[in-house]
Amino acid sequence: MSYSYEITPRPVELGGGWRLRLLENEEEMGGGVFPVDDSDADAGMRWWNECNEQERAHWLTMAASARPADAYHAFMLAEAYADAESTAYEWLDSREEA
């Protein structure tokens, strides 16, 4: 058996973020969607205020923007990807145990 996964971007009109496909012998066996919800401006402001200068610079670079809202979106996008990847690893680990 061959187990793998794919994480691909989702269209913005569907909520953005990522789509996870869990594959067994290249056939989809499951998966999920990991949207980005950065609509809470207060949460974004709290996040920005908690970042140190290095973190702010990093996320502004990742966003290719000088706007804190774009940095927050880049952060949320990275978090959604990490969640998708974590789910994929859990699935892969469960296949190895079977």
What are these regions (language model features)?
Residues 2-98:
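Alpha-helical propensity feature that highlights long, continuous alpha-helices across diverse contexts
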